[in-house]
Amino acid sequence: MVLISTSQGDIRLKLDEENTPKTAANFLSYVRSDFYKDTLFHRVIPGFMIQGGGLNAQMETKNTETSVENEAKFGKKNTRGSVAMARTSDPHSATAQFFINLADNAFLNFSAENAQGYGYCVFGEVVEGMDI
């Protein structure tokens, strides 16, 4: 379990280390190094998702480690309450930023091993705090 403390309340995550071991280990590495301390959810789109993990309170981008392989084809779907890695147009570019799905977002799921179909890797789920 991972605890995210925000100004609005706490969010508890359960990671899917069985199906997405590289992605879960990547996220835990950032957690254990206190990388996420004093970061914020900088992208909030009601009815879609909230994204965080890359910017500090001054809206400055934090330096990250190398990217992690996209394990979306092994993971779960982008449903309400799932936690997925944010990335650029490169399917294997995820580093520290992640998002919580506020709705079922099937269009973000894996569909093919190409740039358009790789999707966004779900590596966990919110088990407490979706209501904050």
PLM regions: where:
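Cyclophilin-like peptidyl-prolyl cis-trans isomerases
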Residues: 1-132
